Amino acid sequence: MEEKSSGGGVRLHVGGLGESVGRDDLLKIFSPMGTVDAVEFVRTKGRSFAYIDFSPSSTNSLTKLFSTYNGCVWKGGRLRLEKAKEHYLARLKREWEAASSTSDNTIKAPSDSPPATHLNIFFPRLRKVKPMPLSGTGKHKYSFQRVPVSSSLPRSFCDCEEHSNSSLTPREIHLHDLEAVNVGRQEAEVNVMNSVMNKLFEKNNVDPEEDNEIEADQDNLIINVASSGNDMDSALDMLSRKRKSILNKKTPSEEGYSEGRKGNLTHPSKNRQTISLEETGRQESSQAIRGKKKPSEVVPDKSSDEPSRTKDLEQSIDNISWSQKSSWKSLMANGNSNDFSVSSFLPGVGSSKAVQPAPRNTDLAGLPSRENLKKKTKRKRVTSTIMAEDLPVSDDIKRDDSDTMADDIERDDSDAVEYYTACESMADDTASDSVAERDDSDAVEDDTAIDSMADDPASDSVAESDDGDAVENDTAIDSMADDTVSNSMAESDDGDNVEDDTAIDSMCDDTANDDVGSDDSGSLADTVSDTSVEAVPLEFVANTEGDSVDGKSNVEKHENVAEDLNAEKESLVVKENVVDEEEAGKGPLKASNKSTGGSSWLQKASWTQLVSDKNTSSFSITQLFPDLTSDKGEAAGVINNVGNQFSNSNQTASAMKQTDYASSSGGFVAAGVPVDSTPVRSLDENRQRLNGKNVSEGAKLGAKKKIIKRKVGSGDTCTFMRSSTSLKEWAKAKKALSEPRRKKNSEE
């Protein structure tokens, strides 16, 4: 049921109605409190309620109604009174009425809008529109200078005097910029200038229409400046045309000035290299004069430009050549010529510019020469030299002792060569010339020494150099010709009279190149000519003999090599026998310990050389174990016979001139000694006597070192021999190992 009053009725919801309640029952209850306009029942699906449009008679009547009937049991139901919403149809009517009434009243915008105080600007990066205040910020805003803004809006957002004025047009801005150039010029000055220019134009009969042209003097300075804004466009056009005409016109004086500048434009680094100090001073003074004078007064100096440039180039070449060290001159100059000229290598330099040799430097007189340095190093070690006929020139010897000989030579001469190299790098051109002269004099001395030895091989060859240095050669001929070999050997051991053997080295080089025809001997002689050759000790003799026996397949290729090898062996054995004769009381092995090669020769000997006797020609195992069978002795004899045949078959005359060869019983050949001479007979007798002693000593040594063989009798037993007990134990162990496997098989 619903009740509504015209005077502001209220829609009420009455729930909990009984089935027997009707319209009249509700009117009896609500009519004393107010007026009931409409009642609507809703009875669906067990529900029973009503909407009543009620208009209360007083403000307290509605409250009294709720307090009286809300929650009351009436006709089988409990009443519930509540306020309900407005009916939707009534709401629509009201809205339609309100819309129809307001359609005639249109809102009109006011005619005068208030002035805008902000400018809304969209910032893409911020993605929002921000209002920018048009005034009152107190700061200069130059963020949007290039944006064309209408005249109604200000150009800048500032209240200062500069920006408070009205915005200017682009033409006015251009005129304002031109007037800013004329800072400090007043109108009176401009008027004076205009009057002066007008008088000048009248004298020159210039039309008054050309008064606005801009004149330029020789310094290209603008005198007339237009200050009026009306004729500014024409003035700018005239100015551009005038500048083009000035740039296109060039006077002869300006062309000469430009050519002079082109001739003098060079890089500062090039001037430092090619221009001398005097000419740089001249150019600086001329450039200063050009800076002070006008371009028309400068006269280019073309005549002196090119000759001075070529002259500076030649002087720079001379300076570069003199700035180098003296070592390259000594390398480039010929060894026989004392004068060196740059014109032979630099064709651009004339003969007058050739480099003259410097005077001999007297400061280098105190420096030690190569000969003196070698003498000092030779006195430190005890050496004995051999003749050129005894030099080994074969590849076999070169392979056997190349490492040891190179180590000895480099170790002995390294200090002298380094010191001499340091002195040579400090020397001037004179030092290189003096070295060349010294080398030539050494070569002459070597040739003289060779000739003297060829004439008298049994005499001592002494060569005197230009400096007065005496070269004394201790050769094998001296030791065999005289009985005073022991005295000379003792003196060489003390290190008092050992002289430089550079002449022997060069002599070996010359004789080997002239007399020996094979390539191998020539290459070895060239190598030996730069360094001193030491005598090979006795261990080396034995080693070379063994190598010659092993190298049986190379007999046809190296016949000359074997002959020279045998000659060297014989000479060394003769020397060692003489030493043993002089020192017989000291034991047969003491002379071999005094070998001149140093301790490195002893360390590099084979076991056959260490075990064998020093004076015997070959080594045999029978010397130590005489109980061996005769088969081994026969094999050793066959080896010795092969060595004898190998040494005797090489009888070609390719080793040295004016030398005689004789085969010895031990397979050695003595070179350069007459067979029928008295010293050779005495040496043969001494050799036989010493060989007898050595054989007896070898027999004693072999008897001492006899091998004791142990014979095991039949009664002796070994713990590891097979026996019945060992077989039984082996069977038990085998059975014990196989039992677990049998158990496994039975279980499966």
Swiss-Prot record:
Residues 266-288, 520-531 have a biased composition (Polar residues). The keyword Cytoplasm does not apply. Keywords: Nucleus, RNA-binding, RNA-mediated gene silencing. Residues 294-314 have a biased composition (Basic and acidic residues). Ubiquitously expressed. It is found in: Nucleus; Nucleus, Nucleolus; Nucleus, Nucleoplasm. GO terms for molecular function: RNA binding; single-stranded RNA binding. Residues 10-86 form the RRM domain. GO terms for biological process: regulation of gene silencing by regulatory ncRNA; regulatory ncRNA-mediated gene silencing. SUPFAM superfamilies: RNA-binding domain, RBD. Residues 244-318, 350-531, 579-600, 729-748 are annotated as: Disordered. Its main location: nucleus. It comes from the Eukaryota. One of its GO terms (cellular component) is nucleolus. Residues 403-416, 439-472, 491-518 have a biased composition (Acidic residues). Disruption phenotype: DNA hypermethylation (at CpG, CpNpG and CpNpN sites, N is A, T or C) leading to increased siRNA-mediated transcriptional gene silencing (TGS). Narrow and slightly lobed second and third pairs of true leaves. Disrupted ROS1 subcellular localization in the nucleolus. Gene3D superfamilies: 3.30.70.330. RNA-binding protein required for DNA demethylation and to eluviate siRNA-mediated transcriptional gene silencing (TGS), probably by guiding ROS1. Can bind specifically single stranded G-rich RNAs of 21-, 24- or 26-nt corresponding to promoter sequence of target genes; this interaction directs demethylation of target sequences. The RRM domain is required for single stranded RNA binding. This is Protein REPRESSOR OF SILENCING 3. It comes from Arabidopsis thaliana (Mouse-ear cress).
